[in-house]
């Protein structure tokens, strides 16, 4: 292993994974991920997703609570995997809408009648019902098999990849990670991963930028945590054997489970085929306004 790769792994990637595990994300090896994916082109962790769709979803008819049919569970998984024919951002919007609102599927009820019921991919109201995983070196292949990429860290909710982190050695600018992330989203690389991603992060331990799918380089932002009580308590809980880095502070700020819920549910938007995620100033200003109205 050359020195740059060694530093990337040991100064950035490994500490990030350890911190995320301490924050409640379950590590799953690349090999175990691949068994669930079906191929290196596909990116959903299907066994986890299937199990969560069964667990999270019931419909009520005539006072009886019922499970969705196995066929509808499979259909819901297939339909979440939207084709990229409309381009990455429009496809990402379709996926985002499904993650927020679910999809409706017909079930046969009494006397052979068919009624439609809503099926959810993420339980926004009972957040602890969801499963959170991380993996590393997530090998993904382009559709024509001419390109492949291996994002350093991918985060999942219920087997759905919602965030990607690209790590660099401390002496390599985080801008290189930004450029790599943007390249990987191009049509001839691995856009099928990024149609699910809501948060993307470029880090070299000492400097961090974040964005969302399709964000041009000039609009990648830095996050400055304004809730010092939250941040300091989390760092004290999860990092006990070293001095926290800028990367640590950003991981806590962006990927603490409750913060993920807020950012993804309320602070991602689509405007004229542009996908946006809030700047930190917007996040804290809106939270201050809404908390004052309670």
Where are these regions (language model features)?
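ATP-dependent helicase/translocase motor core
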Residues: 2-11, 15-294
């Amino acid at each position: 292993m050359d020195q740059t790769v060694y530093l990337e792994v040991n100064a950035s990637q490994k500490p990030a994974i350890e911190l995320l595990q301490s924050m409640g994300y379950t590590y799953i090896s690349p090999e175990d991920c691949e068994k669930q994916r079906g191929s290196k082109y596909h990116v959903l962790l299907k066994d986890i997703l299937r199990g969560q769709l069964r667990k999270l979803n019931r419909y009520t008819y005539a006072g009886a609570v019922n499970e969705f049919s196995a066929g509808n569970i499979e259909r819901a998984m297939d339909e979440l995997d939207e084709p990229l024919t409309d381009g990455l951002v429009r496809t990402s919007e379709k996926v985002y809408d499904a993650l927020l609102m679910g999809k409706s599927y017909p079930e046969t009820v009494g006397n052979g009648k068919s009624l439609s019921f809503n099926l959810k991919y993420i339980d926004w109201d009972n957040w602890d019902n969801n499963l959170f995983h991380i993996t590393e070196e997530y090998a993904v292949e382009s559709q024509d098999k001419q390109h492949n990429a291996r994002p350093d860290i991918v985060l999942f909710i219920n087997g759905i990849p919602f965030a990607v982190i690209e790590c660099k050695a401390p002496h390599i600018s985080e801008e290189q990670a930004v450029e790599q992330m943007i390249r990987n989203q191009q049509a001839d690389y691995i856009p099928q991963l990024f149609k699910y991603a809501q948060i993307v992060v470029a880090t070299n331990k000492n400097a961090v930028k974040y964005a969302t799918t399709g964000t041009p380089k000039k609009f990648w932002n830095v996050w400055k945590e304004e809730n010092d009580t939250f941040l300091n308590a989390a760092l004290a809980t999860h990092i006990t054997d070293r001095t926290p880095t800028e990367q640590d502070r950003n991981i806590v700020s962006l990927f603490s489970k409750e913060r993920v819920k807020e950012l993804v549910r309320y602070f991602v938007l689509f405007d004229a085929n542009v996908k946006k995620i809030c700047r930190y100033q917007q996040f804290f200003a809106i939270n201050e306004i809404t908390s004052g109205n309670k």
